[in-house]
């Protein structure tokens, strides 16, 4: 595995401009809501990207990415849909035409990384999301920005076996299964 030496962006930043001052009662209520609410973001790109955006393609060429577990937890989310797609930029500048192999590589790298982190778990349904919350873990719900299956419908089964339960049919362009326009 070739890990990237490219400096990555910070996962958590303190944005003072959006801080809301709460009194003690409001703070208690807010904390209670955070603890009791199951909060899911179904369209996230939780890959930690380079500090310098011009290094993104170089970063994508590595075979190990950092994932935003810390940011997801800090944001109070129970689970996030991962909207995998970025590795596809290695071979095209039009996201509607990413290669299936690139998409599957990114999903595989993410799932492999999840297995190495005790505080994160792959989730595929509501029961697993609730279990992750009860265990104090962050759930990563593998999704794809679009299917990128071309005319090979059996690839839907491949993605299903990789844990994909939610996918955009197209990105922008027409394909065999939908029209993004």
Predicted features and spans:
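N-terminal hydrophobic targeting/anchoring segments and the immediately downstream early-domain regions
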Residues: 1-181
